[in-house]
Amino acid sequence: MSQKIRSTTVIAVRKDGKIVMAGDGQVTMGETVMKGNARKVRKIYDGKIITGFAGATADAFTLLEKFEIRVKEFSGDLTRAAVELAKDWRTDKMLKNLQALLLVADSKTTLLISGNGDVIEPEEDVLAIGSGGNYAYASALALMQNTNLSAREIAEKSLQIAGKICIYTNGKIITEEI
């Protein structure tokens, strides 16, 4: 019997020269919470880039590894690395079956990378992915437009709100900031 592993809400918020990415810690298999403190956001490239993932964990780690190789290959050029990963992801026989989404950000740019070959830069200074992504996204937009909270506070409060709505999102938040 194969049960779908569900996990995650990850959000990126850019405000006042800061980029913050935060993710909850829950991994769920079927109706069971398997882990409550998974690390879904991390810094790479000497702390200059933040990455986050949603989807199948093994798939996401494979893609993060490939992305990190591309970042090094292109000397930290986030956009070029993202575009090249998206091309690989879409055309490689093994990679195209991977089920995950990636958020990546550096001091200037935030991008969503998908297996469809999409590399999307947000119109707003917020991006969110995962099972609770829409809840976190809506919360963050409201907080950005109606409060003076910092990027970190907006990211964390948005995940807390998503966790109250989405059963696949918990309140154990890990945050990274550049």
Swiss-Prot record:
Enzyme class (EC, first level): hydrolase
Summary of activators and inhibitors of this protein: Allosterically activated by HslU binding.
E.C. code: 3.4.25.2
Cell location: Cytoplasm
Reactions listed under catalytic activity: ATP-dependent cleavage of peptide bonds with broad specificity
One example GO MF annotation: metal ion binding
Keywords assigned: Allosteric enzyme, Cytoplasm, Hydrolase, Metal-binding, Protease, Sodium, Threonine protease
Entry keyword Hydrolase: yes
Residues annotated to bind Na(+): G163, C166, T169
Any single GO BP term: proteolysis involved in protein catabolic process
Domain of life of the native organism: Bacteria
Gene Ontology CC: HslUV protease complex; proteasome core complex
Family the UniProt entry places it in: Belongs to the peptidase T1B family. HslV subfamily.
Function: Protease subunit of a proteasome-like degradation complex believed to be a general protein degrading machinery.
Assembly description: A double ring-shaped homohexamer of HslV is capped on each side by a ring-shaped HslU homohexamer. The assembly of the HslU/HslV complex is dependent on binding of ATP.
PANTHER family tied to this protein: ATP-DEPENDENT PROTEASE SUBUNIT HSLV, METALLOPROTEASE TLDD
Protein name: ATP-dependent protease subunit HslV
Organism of origin: Treponema denticola (strain ATCC 35405 / DSM 14222 / CIP 103919 / JCM 8153 / KCTC 15104)
Lineage of producing organism: Bacteria, Pseudomonadati, Spirochaetota, Spirochaetia, Spirochaetales
